[in-house]
Amino acid sequence: DIIPMGFGFTDEERVKPVELEKNGIKVALFNSVFLRLENWIQTDGEPGICMAKGNELAARISSYKQKHPDTKIIAVVHWGVEFMPYPSHQQQMDAMLLASAGTDVIVGHHPHIVQPVKKIQNCTVIYSLGNFVFDQKREDGNKAKMAKVTFRKNETEVILYDIDIVKCRPEVSRK
C-alpha cells in the first residue's frame, strides 16, 4: 500500500506525519515543500500539499518529539536550487533547524542532481537524492542515490546506493 503524506484538505491534515511501526520501532514521516511551486495555487477547502517552511516544520517536529520521545523521525523535504551540486545556505539553515528539533533523517529532493550527505548532531542529512525517474539531458541529472534507512532502538543506519538513469529508468550502478 502507498500511504499519502504531506497531503490533506486542511493545513493540520497536511502537516500531520504518517506513523509506522515495525518490530517495536515507531517511525513518523513528515513531508513538506519548502519552495513555491510553478502553476500551483493552494485553494481553501480543496486538497493540497504541506508547504510548511523549515521553522514551521521544525516546530511541529519538536512538539511531536516531546510527545513521542522514542519515535524515530524522517523529514522528506522538497528544497534547494535546481542543478546546484551543493546545498544552498537556506537548505543548510533548515537542516540545522530540523536536526535540532529531533529529526533523525532528512531526505531532500528537488535539485535534480545529487548533493552531499552530512551529519548534523545525530541527524543524517541527505540534501538531494537527485533524479530517480526523469528525462534529463545533463550528465549529472542521470545520477541518483537510493537510501535504505534502518532504525534500531539506539541506532540509525543509512545506506546509499548509486543509481544510474538509463533511458529514463533507474538502475543500480555497476561501478
Residue ranges of predicted features:
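Acidic, metal/ion-coordinating pockets
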Residues: 1-175
